[in-house]
Amino acid sequence: MTWADEVLAGHPFVVAHRGASAARPEHTLAAYDLALKEGADGVECDVRLTRDGHLVCVHDRRLDRTSTGAGLVSTMTLAQLRELEYGAWHDSWRPDGSHGDTSLLTLDALVSLVLDWHRPVKIFVETKHPVRYGSLVENKLLALLHRFGIAAPASADRSRAVVMSFSAAAVWRIRRAAPLLPTVLLGKTPRYLTSSAATAVGATAVGPSLPALKEYPQLVDRSAAQGRAVYCWNVDEYEDIDFCREVGVAWIGTHHPGRTKAWLEDGRANGTTR
C-alpha cells in the first residue's frame, strides 16, 4: 500500500518515535521490541557516528541525558559506548533487567530486528547535523543499507527504509546517491517546508512538527500537489491524532505507538474520524 493509498483510506501509518519511548527508554532494543509488538507500522531512530566509524542510535550529541556516561558520542569508540547503561534514567528500568535490553543499540542491530520481524515494518533513520563527521554520516548509512539490501528498492513505496534530516544538504546527498530511497526533509516552521527547499533537494516527503502543522494545516494539500507526503512528529494526544488524520497526514510519529494504533483502528472500524 502506498502512502497515498493509506491517506485515502483515512488511516495514517504509525511510526514509533525512538521506539515505544514513553513506556521504555528511547533508542533501546526494549523500546523498539515493544513498539513492534504493539503493532507499529514503522520505527524511527536518530543516528550518530562513533569515533571509530560505527552508527549508533543516540539522539543527543552528549551522553549525559540518556546514559550513565558523559561527553560527546562522536569522541568515543563503540567499545567505550558499550560500557554504559542506557536505561537507568527511565521509570521503567529495573535492576534485574526485566524491563528489557537497554544496552547501547547500533543501527545494525535495529535494522536486523526490523527486517527479521514477522511483518513488513519501515525504519525511518534521521541523520543529525551539524556534526563532527559531516557527510560521512550519510556515506556510512548508505553503506549499511546496501549491506542489508535495502538501499535500492524497486520503488519508493516498497522501500523498507526512509532517510530523514533537518539538513537539506543531507537529504540531497541521499537523493543523489540513492534516488529510489524515500527521504523526508524535517522542519519546525511551515514557512521553511513550503519554500523551495524540499523541491530543490528532491525530498519525497516533508516532516513538520505538530505545532508547525497546526499553524498551517494547508501544508498537507500543498505538499500533495507537489507529489510529497507528510510525516508529522511528536503526535501523542488523541485530539492531535484525529487532527493529523483529518488533514491527511501519511505518517504519525508518536511516543505511544500502541495506543495511537488502537485509536486509529477503532475510528476506522466505526467509520468515524471522531
Curated annotation (Swiss-Prot):
It catalyses: a sn-glycero-3-phosphodiester + H2O = an alcohol + sn-glycerol 3-phosphate + H(+). Was identified as a high-confidence drug target. PROSITE patterns: GP_PDE. Keywords: Calcium, Glycerol metabolism, Hydrolase, Metal-binding. This is Probable glycerophosphodiester phosphodiesterase 1. Binds 1 Ca(2+) ion per subunit. Induction: A possible member of the dormancy regulon. Induced in response to reduced oxygen tension (hypoxia). It is hoped that this regulon will give insight into the latent, or dormant phase of infection. The gene is glpQ1. Belongs to the glycerophosphoryl diester phosphodiesterase family. Its cofactor is Ca(2+). Its EC number is 3.1.4.46. The lineage of its organism: Bacteria, Bacillati, Actinomycetota, Actinomycetes, Mycobacteriales. One of its GO terms (molecular function) is metal ion binding. It comes from Mycobacterium tuberculosis (strain ATCC 25618 / H37Rv).
